């Protein structure tokens, strides 16, 4: 950090003056203000660089996003295959249920005919 430098001219005036005159105080305040502004500017760039580095470390990179996208794509494909299998099983079950319902109406006739042929 930069130290605030008070010029020897100001020190001499301060040491010789019994009280500070207005122009001395104004010029001293202006120099102090400029020194503070300079320190703030230097710290601003340091803090900005630190924040940028911190964000770089914390945020996901394009490679990270592509890896996640690839993993999600594989999971979605597996889920699609499982859903298709389930749909096929449900269709099969629906066909079986419909056949049972249809044949249940004719079940006594079918059983009777089967018994007669024996």
UniProtKB/Swiss-Prot annotation:
Main location class: membrane
Localization of this protein: Membrane
Keyword annotations: Membrane, Transmembrane, Transmembrane helix
TM spans (from-to): 95-115
Organism superkingdom: Archaea
Family: Belongs to the M.jannaschii MJ0023/MJ0349/MJ1072/MJ1074/MJ1107/MJECL16 family.
This protein's name: Uncharacterized protein MJ0023
Organism field: Methanocaldococcus jannaschii (strain ATCC 43067 / DSM 2661 / JAL-1 / JCM 10045 / NBRC 100440) (Methanococcus jannaschii)
Taxonomic path: Archaea, Methanobacteriati, Methanobacteriota, Methanomada group, Methanococci
